[in-house]
């Protein structure tokens, strides 16, 4: 038996889950937020308890030290050597990483170089990896890449219709993201449907603060909505999703607050989407509250959100030439029944119909009617478990 930590590190946060492997039992989980800021928050959940501390945590190395000390302090482990592996979620692996890998100096260097593809994510992941390697140098660290699952896309799908030199010289192409989540829920959908994954055509919709839709043909990603970076695709919590690229130079010319392309991209990443259009929040619960109050900006943001998701799902019905099931997952996908209802309401032509009594908050499973030609499933994603499984698989190959 061994204990494995699955890590999802952001620029100012470190989310973690500790597993007993190979039993896949969750022993504890938590998150450290506001790293590098005053009043950092460390939350630990274990044995039905919740412990929260307000601390000053200056960087990821301090965060990792606090995490490990908390595991001992709360009696979750007796010593560091009980931990035999650490798995790290890394958003962008580019073309270099087609599967999960054991970390070494070269791997870490490549992850930092690939930050251009995921500037909001890769730097934090690299900081988390470096911190664990410094503190626990003898423990196997594994990187699990969001992009790996999408490396099965055909060249005509992942290339953009621009001169090919930008791909050959600069590797400009579609990479996708959320691959670990899409892979996991597709596997779970096959179990739920009682059919081999290799026979199924699935559309998986990961709808959280980030949103991505994937066309899954016989267990492989054949197309996905996120692109060169996770900014592409449908409207998201704070991200715009797809826009006409000519808007970028136009805004630089027109708005004195936007001095260069980096300013515009920052606005598209952090100040757009549900938050930017509504002026209220990136949280669907707040948007739905605005709908109840007939707030016109909330209504507009919600309608754009639904419209963009429906279009991608419809597009992937064409890519797959039909589908056996549509899967909703992630924060909104799992917990926003109104959103699911309104998305499906625009897709009934494809043979989808949901049971309103099953399409309620907290329900997991098949929410479609018996007559529905395409099954509609709500499945909780578990990226952390996928990461822990890959650590278990790779830790003896170091």
Swiss-Prot record:
This is Acetate kinase. Coiled coil: none annotated. Its cofactor is Mg(2+); Mn(2+). InterPro entries: Ac/propionate_kinase (IPR004372), Aliphatic_acid_kin_short-chain (IPR000890), Aliphatic_acid_kinase_CS (IPR023865), ATPase_NBD (IPR043129). Substrate binds at residue 89. It is an enzyme of class 2 (transferase). Gene3D superfamilies: 3.30.420.40. Pathway: Metabolic intermediate biosynthesis; acetyl-CoA biosynthesis; acetyl-CoA from acetate: step 1/2. The record marks 178, 239 as: Transition state stabilizer. Belongs to the acetokinase family. It comes from Streptococcus pyogenes serotype M5 (strain Manfredo). Homodimer. Its EC number is 2.7.2.1. Pfam families: Acetate_kinase. The lineage of its organism: Bacteria, Bacillati, Bacillota, Bacilli, Lactobacillales. Keywords: ATP-binding, Cytoplasm, Kinase, Magnesium, Metal-binding, Nucleotide-binding, Transferase. ATP binds at residues 15, 206-210, 283-285, 331-335. It catalyses: acetate + ATP = acetyl phosphate + ADP. The active site is at 146 (proton donor/acceptor).
């Amino acid at each position: 038996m061994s204990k494995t930590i699955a890590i999802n590190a952001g620029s100012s946060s470190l989310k973690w889950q500790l597993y007993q492997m190979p039993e896949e039992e969750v022993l504890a989980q938590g998150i450290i937020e506001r790293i590098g800021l005053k009043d950092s928050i460390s939350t630990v959940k274990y044995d039905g308890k919740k412990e929260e501390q307000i601390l000053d945590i200056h960087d990821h190395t301090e965060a990792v030290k606090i995490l490990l000390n908390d595991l001992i302090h709360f009696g979750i482990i007796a010593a560091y050597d009980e931990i035999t592996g650490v798995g790290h979620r890394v958003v962008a692996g580019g073309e270099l990483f087609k599967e999960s890998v054991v970390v070494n100096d070269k791997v870490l260097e490549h992850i930092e170089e690939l930050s251009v593809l995921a500037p909001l994510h890769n730097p934090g992941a690299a900081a988390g990896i470096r911190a664990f390697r410094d503190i626990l140098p003898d423990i196997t660290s594994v990187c699990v890449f969001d992009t790996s699952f999408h490396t099965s896309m055909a060249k005509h799908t992942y290339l953009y219709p621009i001169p090919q030199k930008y791909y050959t010289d600069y590797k400009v192409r579609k990479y996708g993201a959320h691959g670990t989540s899409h892979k996991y829920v597709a596997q779970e959908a096959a179990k739920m449907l009682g059919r081999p994954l290799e026979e199924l055509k699935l559309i998986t919709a990961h709808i959280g603060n980030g949103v991505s839709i994937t066309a899954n043909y016989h267990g492989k990603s054949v197309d996905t909505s996120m692109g060169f970076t996770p900014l592409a695709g449908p409207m998201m919590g704070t991200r715009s999703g797809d826009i006409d690229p000519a808007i970028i130079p136009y805004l630089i010319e027109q708005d004195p607050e936007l001095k260069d392309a980096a300013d515009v991209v920052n606005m598209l990443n952090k100040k757009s989407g549900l938050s930017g259009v509504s002026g209220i929040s990136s949280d669907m619960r707040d948007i739905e509250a605005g709908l109840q109050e007939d707030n016109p900006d909330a209504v507009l943001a919600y309608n754009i959100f639904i419209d963009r998701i429906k279009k991608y799902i419809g597009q992937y019905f064409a890519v797959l030439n039909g589908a056996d099931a549509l899967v909703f997952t992630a924060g909104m996908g799992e917990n926003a029944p109104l959103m699911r209802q309104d998305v499906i309401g625009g897709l009934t032509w494809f043979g989808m119909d949901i049971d309103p009594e099953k399409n309620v908050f907290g329900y997991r499973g098949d929410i479609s009617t018996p007559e529905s030609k395409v099954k509609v499933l709500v499945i909780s994603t578990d990226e952390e478990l996928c990461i822990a499984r890959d650590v278990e698989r790779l830790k003896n190959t170091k």
